[in-house]
Regions:
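C-terminal functional extensions of proteins
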Residues: 40, 47-141
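Active-site glycine-rich loop that binds ribose-phosphate moieties when present
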Residues: 12-19, 23, 70-74
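Short beta-strand/turn micro-motifs composed of small residues
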Residues: 8, 34, 110
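Short, contiguous strand/loop micro-motifs
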Residues: 7-8, 65
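Gly/Ser/Thr-rich loops at beta-strand to alpha-helix junctions
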Residues: 9-18, 37-39, 93-97
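Well-ordered, non-transmembrane segments within structured domains
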Residues: 4-5, 14-15, 19, 110-111, ...
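Conserved nucleotide-cofactor-binding alpha/beta core module
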Residues: 1-3, 14, 21-64
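Structural motif
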Residues: 3-5, 86-87
């Protein structure tokens, strides 16, 4: 892929996100989306810089200060990158809950923490999932 977008989740995971991104091919244009302002424990753009992500990816605030990624609340710059990235890696259950209805291909990486989500999708509570969503369908990997 020439363009990859990683949607960050928890502040504490940003260090591990950097380690993951360091293994992407160097020719790849990598964008790391973070919150524009503090929300619960989600990583902000400033915290992403503190974690060193700016050394391996272009950090882009998503333009919203709400849980998950609600595209109608995000900045036009974020939307442009979201729509043109060849690969989108979405971390965290909140991002899954707000993006799983989108029609584009998205890879979701998260731990199932909510009994309602577990029951509705028939996941086990506490399961770690890597899901590929393409053309409106989810597939477990």
């Amino acid at each position: 892929a020439k363009r990859v977008l990683v949607l960050g989740d928890n502040t504490g995971e940003a260090v591990f996100d950097r380690l993951l991104i360091e293994h992407f091919p160097r020719k790849t244009g990598i964008f790391y989306a973070a919150k524009s302002a503090p929300v619960i424990n989600d990583v902000t753009a400033e915290e992403a810089v503190d974690s060193g992500i700016d050394k391996v990816a272009a950090i882009i605030p998503n333009g919203a200060a709400i849980p998950g990624t609600v595209l109608s609340k995000c900045s036009s710059e974020f939307i442009e990158i979201f729509n043109t990235a060849e690969v989108v890696i979405s971390k965290g259950q909140g991002n899954f809950e707000t993006l799983n209805e989108e029609q584009r291909k998205i890879w979701f990486l998260f731990q199932v923490k909510c009994p309602v989500i577990a029951k509705y999708y028939r996941f086990g509570l506490g399961d770690w999932l890597l899901l590929e969503k393409e053309q409106g369908r989810l597939a477990c990997s």
